[in-house]
Amino acid sequence: MSRLQRYAGESLGPRPHIVVLGSCKVGNFVVSTPVLRGLRHRFPDAVIGFLGSDVTADFEQALPEVDWRASWDATGANAALLLQQFLFERRQRHGEVDLAVNLDGFNPVTCTLVPWLSPRFVAGGSLRSNLRGPLPWGANPRQSFLADSDWDSRSFLDRYDGLFTSNYIAELFCHLAFVSDYVDFRQIMLPSVLPPFEVPDLLIHCTTARAAKIWPFDRWAKVVRTVANWGWRVGLVGSPPSAQKEAYNSGEGEEWLLASTPLQDFRGRTSLIELAGACRKARAVVSVDAGPLHIAAAVGTPTFAVVGNDINGVGASPIRLWLPRVSSCSRSESTYTCDRCSLERFRNDDCLVDGHPCMKGVEPEQIIAWLKSINGLQKDSHL
């Protein structure tokens, strides 16, 4: 049988060898985990490998669904050669790859790695076996939807009426891998480890790689001061300060916030799996649209997403596609409606309107009112 066939849900036979390719972005990884559970439920005797990232390696190593893992973004002079050798050894030990599922299918690295695996079936992005061009999506809508340029709109659901029940990326991934009948895509499960410090009552995360999603720091200050007056301890989480400035648009905002409020600084003090533990232990987490939002929602902590989207979901973030679907997650509603980001398919880094009105349309009182509503919870009542 020829290799690199488009997957259409076929049986894979006894003890299949399946490889899932994931993203280096935290949010992408988190929403990939239902696929892993679905594959394990559908193919209980499978050997499941995961080609992921050094960024999320601690999560990947702790997932019970994963039998082996490697990082496609490892650095070093011989990293590519070592990865090739490792993948060859996995195929020697577990047999040829029956199915490759690329959940980072627009990444040229993962699309190149799929032919290296020489799988019988492919779900998601891949180059052809000769590496000279992309493997066609095929006619099955569970694969061909990847060619659609607009996953966040209501019209997307109209185009795939009867297939998808929502725009949520975890659901799309589960359909892509033909496991939507084997797992609840809304339920995200992440392992966690407690961090080496006393976790404050409230954790906040203020920054993101897209500046269009940044909430003004003076609004954060009002939230922190208000909650501190209740007697709550508030902690700031994120990457180390230098990375926050270089990659996540913090500018001097976080330093100002730390200097002018009772906020405690925990940036750079956790691994991702320890961040999950901190979120699990906290009373609540408030975050802009970024990786910590997805982690907090996944571990079941009351989580509030600060997004510049109006009551109908129009705004700075593709929330139809990305907002967690768990009951513990709530979001802000901006009083300003702007579709400029959606018209750009959210590819713009900065706000396209003077004054950033969508994010300024989120008042601190929304977050404060939400925090008041959970103020009666005990610290560990949701564990």
Language-model features: where?
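Catalytic machinery of carbohydrate-active enzymes
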Residues: 1-383
